[in-house]
Curated annotation (Swiss-Prot):
Family that this chain belongs to: Belongs to the universal ribosomal protein uL10 family.
Recorded name of the encoding gene: rplJ
Organism for this UniProt entry: Bartonella bacilliformis (strain ATCC 35685 / KC583 / Herrer 020/F12,63)
Protein name per Swiss-Prot or TrEMBL: Large ribosomal subunit protein uL10
GO biological process assignments: translation
Summary of the function given for this chain in its UniProt record: Forms part of the ribosomal stalk, playing a central role in the interaction of the ribosome with GTP-bound translation factors.
Amino acid sequence: MNRAEKREFVTWLNKIFQESGSVVVAHYSGLTVSQMSDLRSKIGEAGGAVKVAKNTLAKIALQGTKSESMANLFTGQTLIAYSEDPIVAPKVAVDFAKANDKLVILGGSMGAVSLSVDAVKSLASLPSLNELRAKLVGMISTPATRVAQVIKAPAGQVARVIGAYAQKGEAA
């Protein structure tokens, strides 16, 4: 990478650190190419991305961002998993790390909040934004359905009484 490419990469990475809902930093030493591709595809399907960057460039890109406090995590072979949804990157990274011990979560950030390994794991256990939306819609629609059933019930009872009365009249 020449100087201009490095400068462009640092600018791009700085933008990622500023705009991402969450960033997870992990060691990937020992992962095979197919395992790394699998991680990239899983995070990509969930709406995030994975990037391997030189530690010095990542530290430069962190300067002036809300996530600057996580600069000390960039030692050794590190990768960055990030997503707009604050839950996606931690959830996929932690799930992948459970299945593959070569991926070691170091920490991360969510906006200005620096996250420890335990905080990243806690964040991963939360439902995603889409799951929360689905639960909210379910909670909102359930009372409406019940109200409709309550309103329909008296009319149904009247119809059954009239039907029973009609059958009684036919039998007589």
